[in-house]
């Protein structure tokens, strides 16, 4: 199997994915946005608590 065949299969696979893909509707987009913001806030809060604990433990 040559490089041309590999490239052709790759293009066919991506074309199949793009034909099955669809744009999210407004409700789905809103839900994904809320979940992403919640995840960012959760990770940021955990990072802040770890940093705060580090400051408290090393300062005294």
From Swiss-Prot:
Disulfide bonds: none
Single GO molecular function: protein transmembrane transporter activity
Entry keyword annotation includes Transit peptide: no
Name assigned to this protein: Protein translocase subunit SecE
Species: Aeropyrum pernix (strain ATCC 700893 / DSM 11879 / JCM 9820 / NBRC 100138 / K1)
Quaternary data: Component of the Sec protein translocase complex. Heterotrimer consisting of SecY (alpha), SecG (beta) and SecE (gamma) subunits. The heterotrimers can form oligomers, although 1 heterotrimer is thought to be able to translocate proteins. Interacts with the ribosome. May interact with SecDF, and other proteins may be involved.
Key words, A-Z: Cell membrane, Membrane, Protein transport, Translocation, Transmembrane, Transmembrane helix, Transport
GO cellular component, one term: plasma membrane
GO biological process: intracellular protein transmembrane transport; protein secretion; protein targeting
Gene3D superfamilies, per database record: Preprotein translocase SecE subunit
């Amino acid at each position: 199997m040559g490089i041309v065949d590999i490239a052709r299969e790759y293009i066919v696979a991506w074309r199949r994915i793009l034909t099955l893909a669809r744009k999210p509707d407004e409700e789905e987009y809103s839900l994904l946005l809320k979940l992403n913001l919640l995840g960012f806030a959760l990770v940021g809060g955990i990072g802040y608590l770890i940093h705060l604990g580090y400051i408290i433990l090393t300062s005294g």
